[in-house]
Amino acid sequence: MKIESLDLPDEVKQFYLNSGIMELYPPQAEAVEKGLLEGRNLLAAIPTASGKTLLAELAMLKSILAGGKALYIVPLRALASEKFRRFREFSELGIRVGISTGDYDLRDEGLGVNDIIVATSEKTDSLLRNETVWMQEISVVVADEVHLIDSPDRGPTLEVTLAKLRKMNPSCQILALSATVGNADELAVWLEAELVVSEWRPTELLEGVFFNGTFYCKDREKTVEQSTKDEAVNLALDTLKKDGQCLVFESSRKNCMAFAKKAASTVKKTLSAEDRNALAGIADEILENSETDTSTNLAVCIRSGTAFHHAGLTTPLRELVEDGFRAGRIKLISSTPTLAAGLNLPARRVIIRNYRRYSSEDGMQPIPVLEYKQMAGRAGRPRLDPYGEAVLVAKSYKEFVFLFENYIEANAEDIWSKLGTENALRTHVLSTISNGFARTYDELMDFLEATFFAFQYSNFGLSTVVNECLNFLRQEGMLEKDDALIPTSFGKLVSRLYIDPLSAARIAKGLKGAKSLSELTLLHLVCSTPDMRLLYMRSHDYQDINDYVMAHASEFVKVPSPFDTTEYEWFLGEVKTSLLLLDWIHEKSENEICLKFGTGEGDIHSIADIAEWIMHVTSQLAGLLDLKGAREAAELEKRIHYGAAPELIDLLNIRGIGRVRARKLYEAGFKSSAELAEVDPEKVAALLGPKIADRIFKQIRGRGTSSGIIASEPPEKSPYSGQKTISDY
């Protein structure tokens, strides 16, 4: 099907022709035939790199140029940024694009001036909770990676959000983009959508198992030269010799870092002089962005043409790795499943070096087929590679047979709603009542019966869980005590602040029960909520943290009995996370924190993001309920954002000054932005360097605000910086 033949405005067709897209892929053509451009709901369950995003673009542009507005929902911030960059190319068509992923207690009415809004599912949910007016103008909703409705962490929010959007705008077109799953037909029926299912790919995908020096596919086999003792290194070298690139998936951060180091010396021998120069530049940028041991190791790997990628790296470091790989300079990335989660980063060959992953409940377990398919889908760059290869590495003949039967020849699992538990449902029950989607019990049940959970389970057990949620919300004062579903001011604020009602209840009880409110008291209160992401306890942590608890017992609202092993161990994890935050706000270096707590720089920022948000909630709840702690929590919120002591906050409002530079200025006697404005710039240049000093004084003495500086952009207070189960690896 030719682009020129589509029922689209001429300027849209010309845009794609100018981009070199003349013809649709077969699955795209099928989608058009099934009503994509006629406003029909559609579920596309097709492989990675088969053109799902183009389907979304065509539907959005058709609707927008007819006066509509589009909402593009993604599961991850990184994916939101990637789509935002792509959609900004539509500016030549007069299309305005906005993005929003944080600040969950804002209505963001300003976003409504845009034609395409890119947002995470959590942000979309918060916009609905805050009754954002422009949401009623949405004519097309795109749900990217909709198979993640199966995720215990993020699936319920995506599911309820889609149900609310369909209820609010019954005529709105829903376009759901999914990996190939076992029950796509069931998902399509729930969405009242046409279904496009296909295994077609623009580049051939060869899936197989590597064993004893040979890559075995279904209908062919290929011998690989054994240049080293590591089979995955040999597979990578084989690809590099043919001008390809490799993604290697590992089961843990430790393993992916170790493999990048192991492969470095071999990969380095394949680099051209031009590659080496470019890689040296990337390595220098890595070191400019971070001074931790991990970033130093990453820079060493990058100079040799390899890299590692996991959620322990900060976003700037991950982006430098991704950009270096896209540019063809980095030849091999060793990654945890972060790169399988929707980002557009394909390679000639994908190597799954370990098909098992650790679970705290069950130990090492095989990954789902769906996750394998997501990894395998990264193989083969459209228009660049003649083919793609997805390779599982077997260590024995028994494992070889297992991998072939359970992955290569297997179909992806069915996806199942995870909404049917009190933990998943209580926040959505409160929000549904608070923003008027349901005013009576019958209306609440009618709404919930429109969810995927009710569709799959025929309402089995739903009323029982709903009643448990309602009893909890009434007991905690978030709903009025009578049978009518009327939210209290407490309940409305909890819903608007986008916090789990259980977290809000714990915060309120903690503030009431605390004898005093030290930094540790408030930090631990935040870390005791279910919204918080906790650090793992290592075997040698227990004694140290237990000793700390004994020495500071009076600063905790409640210390559980050590004889209740499960509860006490969880409590120690809360304390460990609190101590990380305590070091953070007292300006310990990131490298020192990483080494002390056995974590990554990216984890520090992720934990601080979540803690900042919950501390913001704590301040707001204390103010509403007239409890002590509102002022203290508000100050700690700022300190967590910057990772600094209170005396540095004024300096940290200047863009370009971080916690380290602010401390240098303060110790040199420049203790506020007002004092800094009166200083000879040469003195600051001697302290921070001429470039930084120039930027600072342009703000202070140039386009300043009424206070004399340009304040940094407000923090994105988001409890969802990463995706659990995948991005936390």
Swiss-Prot record:
CDD domains: DEXHc_archSki2, SF2_C_Ski2. It holds the Pfam family Helicase_C. Monomer. Its EC number is 5.6.2.4. Keywords: ATP-binding, DNA damage, DNA repair, DNA-binding, Helicase, Hydrolase, Isomerase, Nucleotide-binding. The keyword DNA-binding applies. GO terms for molecular function: 3'-5' DNA helicase activity; ATP binding; ATP hydrolysis activity; DNA binding. This is ATP-dependent DNA helicase Hel308.
